[in-house]
Structure formats: structure tokens, C-alpha cells
Regions:
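Short, surface-exposed coil-to-beta transition loops
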Residues: 51-53, 111-115, 138-144
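Short beta-edge strand/loop motif at the mouth of beta-sheet-based domains
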Residues: 74-112
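Beta-strand/loop substructures that line and gate deep hydrophobic ligand-binding cavities in soluble
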Residues: 131-177
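Terminal, regulation- and interaction-focused segments at domain boundaries
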Residues: 46-62
């Protein structure tokens, strides 16, 4: 796996209104009231001045990468290879919970990461309202995964915005050690 990592201070970011409008459009007929986590995310997406941009490349098709990120059984196998589980920080025996539909919730790493899928375009794009358990109540961020075919490989163009200021370094380590590196091992 090769990658390009960065985090940017003062990155351009969507306004709260743009995020809420985009999320509402992405959910279409899925009603905001019926999705508590999404409703909280829409009301309180944080407005940080930092952003993470990464472009890991995986030796797998877009379909395999997409399925590994959206299928609970496959992502559980990725979780078992993660730095969090290997170090004992997270329990590997707690299954990943992922509802693979727009508006569906996910719960990963024993509830340390939770969120809601705002947009799922199979084999192309995943957009999530995403949060870490220790963030202040109502603090949500936006994670966007775009899958780009590169011959027989897949480049994952990843942007993470709206997280609490000061968390970029920790999150960057987490994306590498708990998502990209174990995902590359799983797909190998």
C-alpha cells in the first residue's frame, strides 16, 4: 500500500447549512426524524479549522475495497488486524455493526467509533457522519471515501473534515493504523 497523507489547517470546508442540506438530499426519503444519530450530526457538526486528506492505494478492485468498508463481516476481519486491537486498546471480539444503506448506522471498535452513512454509491463513494466516543456530545465530523480505479488497483481519495480542533494528529494515526494498513493486509 502506498499513500499520500496530510492534514491542513484552515482548509476550506462546507458551511453547516451546506452539510445539513447535502445530508438531507443524500438521505432523500429517509426522514431526518427517524435517524437519531444523523439528526444529532446534522444539528451539531463541528467546525474545526483542520482537515485530513489521504490517498492510500490498495491492490484490489473498487468493488472489493467498497465491500470491505461497508460489509460488517468483512470489516470485522479488518478490525482484527488493526493497531487498536493488536495493542489491546480495543476488543477484537466485539463485532463491527454496519448497516450498508444510506441512513444506516455503524458502530466500530467496540463503540469507540460511531456514525451514520449519509451517502453510499456502490464501488464509488461513501460519505459518513462520523464521531469518536470521547468527543463532546453532539460533535460530528464528515468522512468521505472516493474510490478511483488505477489499473488493477484502487486509490481511495479520503477527506475527513469537521472534527474537533487539535485531533488531526491522533485521527491521522488512527486512519493509518486502524483502517488503511489493516485494510491493505485484509485485501492482500
Amino acid at each position: 500500500m502506498s499513500s499520500r497523507n496530510s492534514f491542513h489547517a484552515e482548509a476550506s470546508k462546507p458551511t453547516r447549512r451546506q452539510i445539513i442540506t447535502g445530508a438531507a438530499l443524500a438521505l432523500g426519503s429517509f426522514g431526518l426524524a427517524s435517524t437519531q444519530a444523523f439528526a444529532e450530526a446534522a444539528q451539531e457538526i463541528s467546525h474545526a479549522e483542520e482537515a485530513i486528506h489521504q490517498e492510500p492505494v490498495f491492490k484490489a478492485s473498487r468493488k472489493r475495497v467498497y465491500e470491505a468498508l461497508t460489509d460488517a463481516r468483512q470489516f470485522q476481519k479488518v478490525t482484527l488486524l488493526s493497531a487498536a486491537v493488536q495493542s489491546g486498546m480495543a476488543k477484537g471480539n466485539t463485532p463491527a455493526e454496519i448497516t450498508a444503506e444510506a441512513g444506516g448506522a455503524f458502530k466500530l471498535f467496540n463503540g469507540f467509533i460511531v456514525g451514520r452513512n449519509l451517502e453510499l454509491i456502490p464501488n464509488e463513494r461513501i460519505v459518513q457522519a462520523w464521531r469518536v466516543a470521547y468527543w463532546p456530545q453532539g460533535a460530528w465530523s464528515l468522512a468521505k471515501f472516493v474510490l478511483v480505479e488505477q489499473g488493477s488497483d484502487t486509490k481511495l481519495v479520503f477527506d475527513h473534515t469537521g472534527f474537533p480542533k487539535g485531533d488531526a494528529g491522533h485521527l491521522l494515526e488512527g486512519w493509518n493504523g486502524n483502517y488503511w494498513e489493516p485494510l491493505a493486509k485484509f485485501l492482500a
